[in-house]
Amino acid sequence: MDTQEEALNQAHTPAPAPTTGPAPTPVLAPALASAATAESRAAYFMREALKEAHAAALAGEVPIGAVVVYGEDIIARAHNRRETDADPAAHAEFLAIEEAAHKLGRWRLTGCQVFVTLEPCLMCAGLMLNARVDACSFGAWDPKAGALGSVYDLSCDPRLNHAFDVIPGILADECGDELTCFFRARRQRARE
């Protein structure tokens, strides 16, 4: 074989794949990428609400936390303070919505989404309706008093003058575990 023929054969032979270096980054289709982004966004904000729930537990309150998001920013955060404030309305969602309204300087919270670790009760779901929030994402279902799908569903009642989106089950296990651990510890202390 002459050198010209050898050169042509080598030019058409693929180079061996490199054996070292980082693996190629998978490219997601735009729809999958946006779904992954939406999922990580929701998880991020729910983790912030979980931080509030943990603060509530440390204060001896039922561990429920909430954040209000406007655009991509958390503008309000709160946790249950019923025992601390001796106030039956001091639910995490209620306090966070009040704070958001004060920060925005308006009672209509259009453009806002509430993230809360437990499905809201009737009072808090009613406040979300009155505040005109765009959406509520919650972690654990509340089969005893939930008002966004478990027992009641105020979010889409046709008799009401507003409706909002509900995204349930965000980090549901983590949110449920926070409550389970709190009440287990409370029962244990009561037995001692």
Specify the residue positions occupied by each region the protein language model found.
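Short beta->alpha transition motifs characteristic of CBS
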Residues: 75-82
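A short, polar/charged loop-to-alpha-helix boundary motif
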Residues: 84-94
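Immediate flanking context of iron-sulfur cluster ligation sites
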Residues: 106-118
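Short beta-strand scaffold segments in enzyme catalytic cores
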Residues: 64-72
